[in-house]
Amino acid sequence: MDASLNQWIRSPINDQPLPPRLTREQGQVIQLRQHIRKTLTAVWQKATHLAVREAGRELGFSINFEDVPGLGEVLGTLPPLEANFDHVRDINLNGTGVTDSIDGFLSNFERIRSLQADKNRLTRLPEALGSMRNLAFLVLTEGTVQLTESSIAALKELTLLERLGLSLNPLGLAPDISRMPALEVLELSQCEQRNWPTGLFDQPRPETFSLNLTANELTSIPDVEPGSDQARTLARTRLSRHRVSDAVLEKYNAYKTSVGIDPERINPPSGVQGRRQWTRGPGVKDKAEKQALWDRLEQAHGSEPF
């Protein structure tokens, strides 16, 4: 791997051989290549400062290129890496401007559990995602990604996902989450969605399931039994009231009322998380009573500002 990376650093930029005296732009590219080589070498050698730990136990290693402008485009020119990176758990490419040429880099990390690449220049889902069957956390917000039938099918196979963030992309088509039983957070704000996610109710969704569909002009809402768990999932969904049809808004408010949520409430009740903050601490007494009090307060009409 060292030999190929060293050769890459000295390789042409934009098909132009390196001159004896580099321009400012060429110098910046060389610096980014060197930074990438240093990071990849360290993680390959399992440098301790890159380890991901939980409760004192080493879970894997992390690659963090966050907020390095221009690095995403340079990563797209990286040659194949002749090394094993199965020990890498997390990759953070937020703010690097990754492009559709990132597949070559990502193909080296099939076993990662977390991939973040917001503020990107992607126009499609990376094909390498199809091999990342261990992914639990995927965030690709703020790009120009559009979904296709093939990319939806590939995304559907990421059955271990717990969080999927695709907000601020012109997706057009809705993602299929029918095979994602562990999904807890789905962010689809401002994604040019007309319909709800495919397979929303093909799996039981927990009380804490969070779905963000704000800034989408929804033209329909699923038909479910008022007061049911499915009605609660719909009622807790965040959407923009002024962007949906009157019929959708009327049914949405009815579902909220059926599960005891103030129909004028903008954000869903905090539920378990709010109760946990209210009742935590070594000096807390009458925990059950406090939980019940919190629930009554959240369900009261007009309680959201409080």
Task: Set out the residue ranges of the language-model regions.
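Leucine-rich repeat domain C-terminal region
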Residues: 154, 176-297
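Inter-repeat linker/turn residues at the boundaries of leucine-rich repeats
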Residues: 83-86, 107-110, 120, 130-133, ...
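LRR N-terminal entry segment and analogous cap-like coil->beta motifs
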Residues: 20-120
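Conserved hydrophobic beta-strand positions in leucine-rich repeat
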Residues: 61-63, 89-93, 112-117, 135-140, ...
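Conserved "Asn-ladder"/turn position within leucine-rich repeats
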Residues: 66-69, 95-96, 119-120, 143-145, ...
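Terminal targeting and flexible regions in eukaryotic proteins, enriched
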Residues: 1-60, 258-306
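Tandem repeat protein-protein interaction scaffolds
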Residues: 141-157, 163, 171
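The feature encodes a structural signal of leucine-rich repeats
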Residues: 49, 72-81, 99-106, 125-129, ...
